[in-house]
């Protein structure tokens, strides 16, 4: 039985809304002025990718800082898994090895890594089509991850309950890392080549 993880999905959908149309908007006005001054499409594309990364990192930094301050104010700040929160986000019970530090590391790191990948995919698709299609494409990719348990369905790699740190029979961490790295590199190269050929 598949239980739709609404809380997880809301977190995953936050980044696409933050990315939305920045790259497309920057193909006009000030962005074009910068492109003319630097005279390098590769440098321009790299600057967009850097902005993309910083936006994702900022979103998660705010989330983690908020959680830190909340825990500090309530006097229950710790690096232990919050059972109630874990079950709300994942719709799964806390594993027997909840004290395993790798579960906590996975929960903190992999959602960020996956968001970095989907943000770049979104920006690249948006550049070739339009911002709405780019945003809907990565949202659909995440939704499909709920129903298809495969590392190529990118959202699976941000779900600790589908990883080998939660259950040894599930997606291996190295598979998740490999998929994220390969997809990021391929999309980065495709985006750069596409932008070099784009008529602005």
Protein language model regions, located:
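Cytoplasmic membrane-interface regions of multi-pass membrane proteins
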Residues: 31, 130, 197-200
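Residue-level recognition of pore/gate-forming positions within transmembrane alpha-helices
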Residues: 51-52, 139-143, 184
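Structural signal for membrane-spanning alpha-helices in multi-pass inner-membrane proteins
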Residues: 59, 63, 67, 71, ...
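Central hydrophobic cores of alpha-helical transmembrane segments
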Residues: 130-146
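Transmembrane helix boundary and interhelical loop/hinge segments in multi-pass membrane proteins
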Residues: 19-37, 41
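Junction motif at the cytosolic side of a transmembrane helix
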Residues: 182-200
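Secretory targeting signals
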Residues: 1-22, 46-127, 131, 162-180
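Juxtamembrane "helix-exit" motif on the non-cytosolic side of transmembrane helices
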Residues: 149-167
């Amino acid at each position: 039985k598949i239980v739709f993880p609404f809380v997880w999905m809301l977190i995953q959908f936050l980044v696409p809304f933050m990315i939305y149309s920045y790259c497309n908007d920057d193909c006009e006005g000030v962005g074009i002025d910068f492109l003319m001054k630097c005279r390098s499409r590769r440098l321009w594309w790299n600057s967009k990718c850097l902005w993309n990364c910083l936006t994702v990192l900022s979103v998660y930094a705010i989330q983690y800082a908020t959680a830190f301050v909340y825990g500090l104010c309530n006097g229950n700040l710790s690096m232990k898994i919050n059972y109630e929160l874990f079950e709300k986000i994942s719709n799964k019970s806390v594993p027997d090895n909840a004290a395993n530090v790798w579960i906590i590391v996975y929960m903190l790191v992999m959602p960020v890594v996956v968001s970095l990948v989907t943000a770049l995919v979104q920006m690249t698709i948006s550049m070739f089509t339009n911002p709405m299609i780019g945003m809907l494409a990565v949202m659909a990719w995440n939704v499909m991850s709920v129903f298809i348990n495969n590392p190529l369905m990118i959202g699976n790699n941000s779900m600790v309950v589908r990883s080998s740190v939660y259950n040894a029979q599930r997606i291996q961490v190295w598979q998740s890392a490999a998929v994220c790295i390969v997809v990021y590199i391929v999309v980065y190269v495709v985006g750069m080549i596409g932008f070099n050929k784009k008529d602005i």
